Amino acid sequence: MARVTDKITHLIKPVIEGMGYELLGIEYVASGKYSILRIFIDTNKSISVNDCEIVSRQLSSIFDIEEPISGQYNLEVSSPGIERPLFHKGHYQCFLGFNVKLHMFRPISGQSNFFGVIGSVSEINNTIELVGELGAIILDIDLIKKANLVVDF
């Protein structure tokens, strides 16, 4: 699935940035006619529904011409929300010390889901140290399928 999101990122990142927003990341969930293409945007001010609508209209026009995904799908443009998704190494670095929930592409020691605090990020090894109830574990960022901040209330 990385190829689809990479292609879309290349296509839309300059457009979104030209509109004054940051492209945080893309999720593509393939499920036949119920597939979802979710685009996360941010800015230094809060994202409104109107912001999402404006970006969605612009991207819809581009996708109608370029057709980066074959078949039907629903386009969703969203703010990161309170449980912000993390897509890149830089995102993990920005949120050192924060609680996260991770879902891996494949199990590691029989476990696919992890919860803990981001302890450190290694530039050299492309890994994060996740500190949880059972201690620290080093995880390869490329093996993380989905990551979100977890907010404690």
Swiss-Prot record:
Chief localization: cytoplasm
One term under GO cellular component: cytosol
A Pfam short name: RimP_N
InterPro entries, A to Z: Ribosome_maturation_RimP, RimP_C, RimP_C_sf, RimP_N, RimP_N_sf
Signal peptide positions on this chain: none
Cell compartments where the protein resides: Cytoplasm
GO BP terms, alphabetized: ribosomal small subunit assembly; translation
Gene3D superfamilies in UniProt: RimP-like superfamily, N-terminal (3.30.300.70)
Keywords for this protein: Cytoplasm, Ribosome biogenesis
Entry keyword Amino-acid biosynthesis: no
Task performed by this protein: Required for maturation of 30S ribosomal subunits.
PANTHER family in UniProt: RIBOSOME MATURATION FACTOR RIMP
Similarity comment: family membership: Belongs to the RimP family.
Name assigned to this protein: Ribosome maturation factor RimP
Organism: Vesicomyosocius okutanii subsp. Calyptogena okutanii (strain HA)
Gene behind the chain: rimP
